[in-house]
Curated annotation (Swiss-Prot):
Similarity comment: family membership: Belongs to the aldehyde dehydrogenase family. IolA subfamily.
Originating species: Bacillus licheniformis (strain ATCC 14580 / DSM 13 / JCM 2505 / CCUG 7422 / NBRC 12200 / NCIMB 9375 / NCTC 10341 / NRRL NRS-1264 / Gibson 46)
Gene coding for it: iolA1
Annotated PROSITE patterns: ALDEHYDE_DEHYDR_CYS (PS00070)
Protein name: Malonate-semialdehyde dehydrogenase 1
UniProt entry keywords in alphabetical sequence: NAD, Oxidoreductase
GO molecular function terms listed in the Swiss-Prot or TrEMBL record: malonate-semialdehyde dehydrogenase (acetylating) activity; methylmalonate-semialdehyde dehydrogenase (acylating, NAD) activity
Length: 484
């Protein structure tokens, strides 16, 4: 359904809102009801080139701004974000569909990264060692790279961009942001508040679009580094194409996160934790719990409680505080998820909770879905479904649970529920995952730690946030000096 007040999105280049040089646009839809709420331009390479030139020009002066002054501007930006928390959450729920509770959580996690970026004077400090030889001192200095870019996904339209441009800009770089064409409204709001904070024009530039914009970023010689978050095939493409063009690239990709449930866990808290991790944000997050590997001794009790509690969850428009599961992002994704559920049934998994027909009249909804007796041969175990679909695999012991999780091509996050320090230590040492939780439902690190997975969940060397983020957005100069 097309609404009469649908917003026309614009690019933001060199401090001004400008139309794309391309003629095409894409509908932005509220996934809770299918209404068109905006039109995002499908920009062309010439738009990217304009943005890069603006950023390149701004870099000449921005890189010379004292680091404390950059941090002060970011603090003003932080204050504006804090003042508009509720409005930002409302935009997220409107264009992404996640519940207001989840949207508020996303807003807070994004703000925490800006808080980190305000500490740049400390984070960018170099190293020094006097008297490395007779009368000679050595030191390491950090400098910005130049123009850098970020390509961000639909599922966290606030948090993921804030993983990127605040820290990059704090380090003295200028930035070109390409948000998902499915969730462009929040990106526009982030840019609006950025310039309201007083930043010079051209420091942050916004270009909407699809693959043409992505390729324009990856192949532009003036862009020195690219940050990406999205699906595994696209992450691999971004990494290979970007590095082939001489860029530094971090590409965060897909996931199939496992939670191992031990017999000595706190059963009630474990069940509630897995429900939140599996079905929160409609399962559309790279840190969602996709598989519960449950030790046989507790499996029946676990399933009984899990099924009972999951059936209490309500599905619907994220604006209702009663709803736990919101819509999926688009109809095409909903159909893909339904195909996976059909596949699980055909391959012999036991459908314990069927979310295919929630009592919702419009929108792209699939309710919380649980499969029991899943095996590694099944597609629902192998593939990232990106939906509120949980697979339960029964294992004999911790060793089998770890072996199961490590078979996955993905290695983003993993969790163990246990009261045994020995089991937790074994899990920590043997599991192949970039981010690990012990009785922590979603082991997404705080902003001062790095965020990245292993194997097909991450392409690159340096993750986002924390010290990794500063290293990614800076280059080092090692200075050896002697004075006569």
């Amino acid at each position: 359904m097309i609404t009469t007040n649908a917003k026309k999105m614009m690019n933001h280049i060199d401090g001004e809102w400008v139309n794309s040089l391309g003629a095409e646009s894409e509908e932005v839809v509220n996934p809770a009801n299918g209404n068109v709420i905006a039109y995002a331009p499908l920009s062309v390479r010439a738009d990217v080139d304009r943005a890069v030139q603006a950023a390149k020009h701004a870099y000449q002066t921005w890189s010379l701004v004292p680091v404390p002054n950059r941090a002060r501007l970011l603090y003003k930006y932080l204050q504006l974000l804090q003042e508009q928390k509720e409005q930002l959450a409302d935009i997220i729920t409107t264009e992404n569909g996640k519940t207001l509770k989840d949207a508020r959580g996303e807003v807070q996690r994004g703000i925490e990264v800006v808080e980190l970026a305000t500490a740049t004077p400390t984070l960018m400090m170099g190293e020094s060692l006097p008297a490395i030889a007779g009368g000679i001192d050595g030191s390491i200095w950090r400098y910005p790279l130049g123009v850098v870019a970020g390509i961000t996904p639909f599922n966290f339209p606030m948090m993921v961009p804030l993983w990127m441009f605040p820290l990059a800009i704090a380090c003295g770089n200028t930035f070109v942001l390409k948000p998902s064409e499915r969730t462009p409204i929040l990106a526009g709001k982030l840019v609006e508040l950025f310039y309201e904070a007083g930043f010079p024009k051209g420091v942050l530039n916004l270009v909407h679009g699809g693959k043409d914009v992505v390729n324009g970023i990856l192949e532009n010689d003036d862009i020195k580094a690219v940050s990406f978050v999205g699906s595994e095939p696209v992450a691999k493409y971004v990494y290979q194409t970007g590095t082939a063009n001489g860029k530094r690239v971090q590409a965060l990709a897909g996931a199939k996160n496992h939670a191992i449930v031990m017999p000595d866990c706190h059963l009630e808290k474990t069940v509630q934790g897995i429900i939140g991790a599996a079905f929160g944000s409609s399962g559309e997050r790279c840190m969602a719990c996709s598989v519960a590997a449950v030790v046989d001794d507790i499996a029946d009790d676990f399933m009984e409680m899990l099924v009972s509690e999951t059936r209490k969850l309500k599905t619907g428009d994220g604006r209702s505080e009663d709803h736990f599961v919101g819509p999926l992002i688009r109809e095409v994704h909903k159909q893909r998820v339904l195909d996976y559920i059909d596949s699980g049934i055909k391959e012999g998994a036991a459908l314990a909770v069927d979310g295919r027909n929630p009592d919702v009249r419009e929108g792209y909804f699939v309710g919380a879905t649980i499969f029991d007796h899943v095996t590694p041969e099944m597609k629902i175990w192998q593939d990232e479904i990106f939906a509120p679909v949980l697979s339960v695999v029964r294992v004999q012991d911790l060793d089998e649970g770890i072996e199961l999780a490590n078979q996955s091509k993905f290695a983003n996050g993993a969790v163990i529920y246990t009261s045994s320090g020995k089991s937790a230590q074994q899990f920590r040492d043997k599991i192949d995952a970039g981010m690990i939780g012990v009785n922590v439902n979603v082991p997404a690190p705080m902003a001062f730690f790095s965020f990245a997975g292993n194997k097909a969940s991450f392409y690159g060397d340096l993750g986002t946030n924390g010290k990794d983020g500063v290293q990614f957005y800076t280059r080092k100069k090692v200075v050896t000096e002697r004075w006569f």
